Amino acid sequence: VTDRGAPATRRALAWLDQRIGAAGFVRTALNKVFPDHWSFMIGELALYCFTILVLTGVYLTFFFHASPTEVIYQGRYAPLRGLPMSEAYRSAINLSFDVRAGLVMRQIHHWAALLFLASIVVHLARVFFTGAFRRPREINWMIGVTLLVLAMINGFAGYSLLDDQLSGTGLRISYSIVLSIPVVGTWMASLLFGGEFPGSDILSRLF
C-alpha cells in the first residue's frame, strides 16, 4: 500500500512497480559494476550513434523518394537546373537545398554512420585483444560480429540510395561480384537488381 503522504514521484513509481514489477530489474541494472576504463565506453558510443541514425533516418525518409524514374530538376541549385536525373537523386538534392534542416540532417546522419561503424570496429578490437570474447562471453562476441556485418550492409545500402556516381560505382561492383558466383550468380544478380544492371528495382529494395 502506497503512503498517501509520500512524494508524488515515489507514489507514481510504486504504482508502476505494482503493475509491471520493474523494481527488481532496475535495482539489478543500477547495482551492476561497470568498468571505469574509458575504452569500455566505445560500445556506448556505438549505441548513441545508432540512436542518432534512427532519428535522423526517420526524418530523411519523409522527403526521400527511392525511384530511378528520370525527371528534370527544377530546384534551387542552379548548376543542375534543367538537367535530367533520377527522382532519387533529385530528392537528395532537394533535401540539401529546399527542405528545412535537410542538409543538417543529412550531414548528421552521414557522420553518425561513419562514427557508428568506427566505434563498432574499435569496440570489437578491444574485446578481441583483451580476450573478452572467451567463454562464457562467446555468444556476445558472435552477436557483435553479426551486428558489424549488418551495419556494413546497411551503410552500403544507405550510400547506394542517392543514385550518384559514387553509389553507381558501388552498385556496379556489387553486381559484378554477385554475377561472378558460380552456377547461381546470374540468377542471384537478376533477382537482386530486377534485371541487368542497373535494373529497375534495386533502389526501392535497398530503401
Report the location of each language-model feature.
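Membrane-embedded alpha-helical bundles that constitute the cytochrome b-like, heme-associated redox core
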Residues: 1-207
